[in-house]
Amino acid sequence: MKDLFGQAILDYQTNNFPEDLYTETSISELDVMPIDYLFRDYKEMPSLEKKALDLVKGKTLDVGCGAGSHALYLQEKNIDVLAIDISPKAVKACQLRGVKDVKVINFLDLDESVKYDTILFLMNGTGIFQNLLLINVYLDKIKKLLNDNGQVLIDGTDIIYMFDEDEDGGKWIPSNGNYYGELDFTVHYKGEIDETINWLYLDFETLKNACEYHQLNCTKVKTEEDSYLAKITL
C-alpha cells in the first residue's frame, strides 16, 4: 500500500501542496473527496456523526480515526479516547493536530485485556469489515473489547439505491454471487493510484442479523436518507 489516503491527510496538515483525493469503486466512477472534509469540526459533521459523538461515554476507542477530527472533539469534552488507524501518515497528522493518544495499529491486533465503554466506527464504519465473511471476525473481536455495559456506535449505508430498477420496481444486481455492498475501493492522489481494497457498504438488517448470530444486540439509533447509525451492545 502506498498509503495515499494518509499522505493526503499529512500533506494538508503540513501544508505540503495538498490536493483533493479521488476515489472509485467497482460500481462507481472517479469521485472527488475534498481533503478539507476530513478536517471538519463538530458543526460541519453530518447529523449521524454528531449523534454518535453525543452518545459517547467512558473510555473510548476511535477506530480508523483518519485525520482525528472525532478524537479531537471528544478530547475537548474530556473523554478518555484512544484513536487508532493503520495509516502511519494519518497518525502523524493526528499527533500534529494535538490528538493525545493515537496509535498505528490494526483493530484486530488490539490487546483484549483492555476494555472500552464506547467503540466508534464512523464515516461508513462498516467498510472496515471488508466483506460479509469477515464481519464474524470483527464482531468476535468487538465482544472481547467491550465492557459489560459498553456500546459500539457504527454508521453504514445501504447502497441498493445505486442499482437500476426494472419495470416491477425490483433492482438489477450483478449476479456474481457476492453481497451487493461488497465493493472494490481505490484511492487516487496526485496522479498516483493506491492498491485496491475491499470495502463493505452494509444495510442495517444484514448488520443486525450478523450481530444476533453473535448474541449481540443491534438497534438503529438514527437514519439519514440511505445511511444509518447503529448501536451494538452485549
Predicted regions mapped to residue ranges:
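SAM-dependent methyltransferase
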Residues: 148-206
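A short glycine-rich, Lys/Arg-flanked "PGG" loop and its adjoining helix->strand segment in the class I
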Residues: 135-148
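Conserved SAM/SAH-binding beta-strand->alpha-helix loop
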Residues: 87-88
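A short SAM/SAH-binding and catalytic strip from SAM-dependent methyltransferases
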Residues: 116-136
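Conserved class I S-adenosyl-L-methionine
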Residues: 57-66
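Conserved SAM-binding strand-loop segment of SAM-dependent methyltransferases
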Residues: 98-109
